[in-house]
């Protein structure tokens, strides 16, 4: 048995122990308070209540900042709601059809099901007998959350002095006053990026993965800017092996037209850099407009593998050309999420809020009633921090084609004049683990 197989077996046993511990009533007497005013009411809250109490008891942290506990509870709510919502709506519908719900209207019937059925732990156990995968997924989710939050707390304590020295300008801190942990997709057993606001007014970014790639990316960016008339701006990155900390980069507008021109000159350089590194997925969420500097805050998708297409039709021929061009990175305008000639621009240079996705996603309708059901809607894009602005006003990038072109040309010329040193510099990317983006490019035309 390999080490990985052994770890998987051990993990499965621990998740099973979570389920068995839940059956004993562990955590039932835990007291907690939800900030309903901030988060809004929760659907099927009596069902969630069982697992919030259990999750708090299992975390078993006596000294934990209030905002971290709030974040932990919020994650339990979001993840278990996502796992269980469809099943609970279906079971409520069955109870209604069998005449088991009491009430004069659909709202009262929902309240009855939520209170009398989901508040009864015996009923919860009956659901688990019918849906064993539901049980498995719920306790697996809690298991990962517990491990990930404990891991963060241990690392924050261990690295305290180093964070003060490197990211806090030597300003000491005692606690975290705000935590945001829903800013990225989760990977590798629920691990996700978090932004921590400390009581010294400094924000730090925690990433539960190696940041060797980010450090190499910034080092390479500094190297390329040697041939530029403008220097690149990097941000502080602390790589701790299998996790790391970063300086928080906040967007800000340009204060004059020259700064805006400088931004797009640097953007041209950025296009060249990511073309060389065969980077992709650098969409609007992964680039911050920091004054006259475009800052890539997630370089996890560099060094993408080239997937050879069969080129049996025009679509595959077009996709092959896109993959081999500067469009592949996602920095320049491109339309995604539709293969019918329509789509939305999610590029770092142009992606903006308010656009309607040309795809349908499920949303719950008639919330808080026994008629709850899924309906499919077109979601609307929300704002990001990728657009360069002048005193808060966005000016179309087409106005600055000359600057973009010049930045690209200067960086290209530097690379061509320093081929051997560039090849040597590329060795900093050896043995770096990157994220492979496997989306079908054909779906994005």
Please report, for each region that a protein language model flagged, where it lies by residue:
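Long, C-terminal catalytic modules of enzymes
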Residues: 399, 403-413, 417-433
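Eukaryote-biased recognition of long, low-complexity, charge-rich segments
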Residues: 338-391, 396, 400
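General beta-strand recognition
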Residues: 205, 245, 295, 354, ...
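Conserved kinase catalytic-core segment
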Residues: 248-350
């Amino acid at each position: 048995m390999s080490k990985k197989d052994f770890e998987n077996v051990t993990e499965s046993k621990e998740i099973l122990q979570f389920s068995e511990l839940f059956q004993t009533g562990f955590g039932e007497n835990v007291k907690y308070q939800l900030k309903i005013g901030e988060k809004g009411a929760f659907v099927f809250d009596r069902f969630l209540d069982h697992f919030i109490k259990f999750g708090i008891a299992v975390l078993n942290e006596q000294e934990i900042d209030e905002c971290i506990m709030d974040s932990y509870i919020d994650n339990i709510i979001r993840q278990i709601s996502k796992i269980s919502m469809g099943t609970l709506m279906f079971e409520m519908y069955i109870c209604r059809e069998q005449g088991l719900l009491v009430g004069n209207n659909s709202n009262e019937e929902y309240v009855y099901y939520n209170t009398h059925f989901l508040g009864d732990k015996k009923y919860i156990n009956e659901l688990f007998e019918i849906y064993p995968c539901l049980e498995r997924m719920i306790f697996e989710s809690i298991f990962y959350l517990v491990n990930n939050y404990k891991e963060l707390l241990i690392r924050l304590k261990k690295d305290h002095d180093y964070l003060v020295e490197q990211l806090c300008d030597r300003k000491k801190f005692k606690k975290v006053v705000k935590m945001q942990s829903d800013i990225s997709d989760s990977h590798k057993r629920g691990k996700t990026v978090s932004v921590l606001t400390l009581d010294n007014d400094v924000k730090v970014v925690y990433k539960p993965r190696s940041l060797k790639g980010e450090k190499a990316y910034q080092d390479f960016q500094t190297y390329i800017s040697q041939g530029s008339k403008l220097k690149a701006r990097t941000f502080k990155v602390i790589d701790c092996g299998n996790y790391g900390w970063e300086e928080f980069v906040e967007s800000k507008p340009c204060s004059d037209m020259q700064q805006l021109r400088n931004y797009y000159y640097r953007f041209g350089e950025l296009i060249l850099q990511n073309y060389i590194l065969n980077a992709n997925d650098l969409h609007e969420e992964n680039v911050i407009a920091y004054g006259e500097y475009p800052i890539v805050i997630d370089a996890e998708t560099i060094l993408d593998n080239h997937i050879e297409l069969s080129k049996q039709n025009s679509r595959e021929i077009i996709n092959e050309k896109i993959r081999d061009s500067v469009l592949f990175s996602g920095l320049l305008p491109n339309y995604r999420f539709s293969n019918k000639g329509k789509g939305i621009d999610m590029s770092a240079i142009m992606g903006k809020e308010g656009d309607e996705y040309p795809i349908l996603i499920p949303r719950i309708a008639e919330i808080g009633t026994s008629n709850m059901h899924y309906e499919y809607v077109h979601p609307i894009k929300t704002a990001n921090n990728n657009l360069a602005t002048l005193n808060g006003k966005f000016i179309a990038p087409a106005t600055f084609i000359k600057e973009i072109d010049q930045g690209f040309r200067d960086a290209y010329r530097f690379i061509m004049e320093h081929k051997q040193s560039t090849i040597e510099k590329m060795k900093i990317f050896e043995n770096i683990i990157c994220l492979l983006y496997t989306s079908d490019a054909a779906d994005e035309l």
